[in-house]
């Protein structure tokens, strides 16, 4: 079991991000890595490199002859600064199929964008596309959004965040 975390909208024809993040069941991470290596190899990406940080495997497949490079992050579950806010099972319960890929549903896609950008992102200034994604999710699911942020943080924090989001 797996899902693509974000930037999946134009896959497989085009990647709109710098990489593709694939969240896999933690117990299947080694198997996912083996499958990914064979996919790279079968598509002419014969040079393989990876950097491993705990459950994050940053993989690069490169093909000299076809001048192609692909960066896919395989992640066993989802951690933010070492903290597991949601288990793989909790996240997987909020997935759907989109263009042949398993992805988060609309609500959780927005929640995870908020969590990643709020707690795990190094740059304090949000890009407009991220602001828009968070804002649109909040506007479509205001009660659920605030309740979920309050559940994983606190009611006071959720209120402050909603105030900021509403001001966009």
What are these regions (language model features)?
Residues 1-20, 24-168:
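Conserved NTP-donor binding/palm subdomain of two-metal-ion nucleotidyltransferases/polymerases, i.e.
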């Amino acid at each position: 079991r797996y899902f693509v975390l974000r930037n999946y909208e134009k896959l497989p024809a085009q990647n709109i991000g710098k990489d593709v993040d694939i969240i896999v069941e933690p117990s299947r991470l080694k198997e996912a890595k083996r499958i990914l290596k064979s996919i790279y190899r079968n598509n002419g990406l014969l040079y393989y490199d990876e950097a491993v940080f705990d459950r994050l495997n940053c993989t690069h497949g490169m093909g000299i002859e076809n001048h192609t490079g692909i960066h896919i992050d395989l992640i066993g579950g989802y951690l933010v600064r070492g903290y597991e806010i949601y288990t793989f099972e909790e996240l997987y319960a909020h997935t759907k199929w989109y263009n042949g890929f398993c992805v988060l549903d609309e609500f959780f896609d927005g929640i995870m964008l908020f969590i990643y950008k709020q707690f795990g992102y190094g740059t304090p200034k949000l890009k407009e596309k991220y602001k828009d994604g968070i804002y649109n999710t909040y506007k479509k699911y205001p009660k659920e959004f605030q309740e979920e942020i309050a559940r994983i943080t606190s009611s006071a924090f959720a209120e402050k965040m909603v105030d900021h989001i509403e001001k966009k």
